[in-house]
Amino acid sequence: MSSKEQKTPDEQVLDQKEAAKGQQADAAPETADVADPRDERIAELEAQLSELQQRERDNMLRVRAEADNVRRRAEMDIEKAHKFAVEKFASEMLPVIDNLERALDTADKANESLAAMIEGVELTLKSLLDAVHKFGIEVVGDVGVPFNPEVHQAMTMLPSADHQPNHVMMVMQKGYTLNGRLLRPAMVAVSKAQD
């Protein structure tokens, strides 16, 4: 080797740096084209995580909605229990009311010696009706109203010139409702058009 061909140590270092830069430049396009398998795995895991988070949000919303529904149903059941707690008792009181009304209907009002007793039965019936009314019990069975199969039970149909067709013309037994729920239908005679 000649002195011209021999390089100084500084030149050798510079040549090595340039060669390294060239190799890096050649290697860089290769790494850019080849995807790192770790990046693919990270993207896959992020997608799974996002899907699981969405499922958990949906489940949480469903559970919350179900809890609200259970709470609402429980409140409605409690309200119904309070509202209709006296239903059995009220049903047992209806024959007592009927008997007091029958006693008044059959009493001899012309007999002066029975006047005090009749007045006492009337006051007792009035007190009883006031008491049951406070608990939501209402009487069904007025004469002259249109026949309603939801609250009336037709016992007979009679021709009548005094009443419109399909109207209650006589009440045989009063009916009762408890807070809008039918306890007992009114037994009635219904008018029909004369032939």
Swiss-Prot record:
Keywords: Chaperone, Cytoplasm, Stress response. InterPro entries: GrpE (IPR000740), GrpE_coiled_coil (IPR013805), GrpE_head (IPR009012). GO terms for cellular component: cytosol. One of its GO terms (biological process) is protein folding. The keyword Cytoplasm applies. Residues 1-40 are annotated as: Disordered. Residues 1-20 have a biased composition (Basic and acidic residues). It holds the Pfam family GrpE. It is found in: Cytoplasm. GO terms for molecular function: adenyl-nucleotide exchange factor activity; protein homodimerization activity; protein-folding chaperone binding; unfolded protein binding. Belongs to the GrpE family. Participates actively in the response to hyperosmotic and heat shock by preventing the aggregation of stress-denatured proteins, in association with DnaK and GrpE. It is the nucleotide exchange factor for DnaK and may function as a thermosensor. Unfolded proteins bind initially to DnaJ; upon interaction with the DnaJ-bound protein, DnaK hydrolyzes its bound ATP, resulting in the formation of a stable complex. GrpE releases ADP from DnaK; ATP binding to DnaK triggers the release of the substrate protein, thus completing the reaction cycle. Homodimer. This is Protein GrpE. It comes from Pectobacterium atrosepticum (strain SCRI 1043 / ATCC BAA-672).
